[in-house]
């Protein structure tokens, strides 16, 4: 499969066969804990605007950007909500985006709800300026760099930071595969694991009944160690 298709769908393939995307990685307890801790901690720190006069620095609470950065960037989010999403986007995708809302005179009056990084395409124009494109509720939006707040993470290039999901896809994929295999073992495993052997020839119905009995009485972690009673010359062969 073309890797570009995976990226367009917000996921990347791995050698383990697992598909890595935001939802699958956050399904890993360790990854969730790390992202939640870092994003929540950083977002809880107040983002201030300062004014320097005569070498002294004071909080510029009367500055128009103070309310946007410190209190509430938009009508739907507090500063904590906004910056928590931004930080989580940086940790997972290496980029965070938000539309800059301006008044007619060009003054910044708000920052839009952060844009999901997978939806954003960045390209450089012949003029050297950056152009951003994304889809919002079915509406295609193209904006210049003066209309987009773009925070880049570690690595990458001017078009964007290095995606953690892409860089660590093999490790994430392996962790997902191990978790899936463990779950399958607990769900389908038979304790003890082996073969049910008999000298008689079983009919189709008898085989079905035997399989259903094994699944009902002995499959799964909850039935581990349960004693098995056999009759009619049946024998359990441990594997």
Report the location of each language-model feature:
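Structured, contiguous alpha/beta core segments that scaffold functional sites
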Residues: 1-239
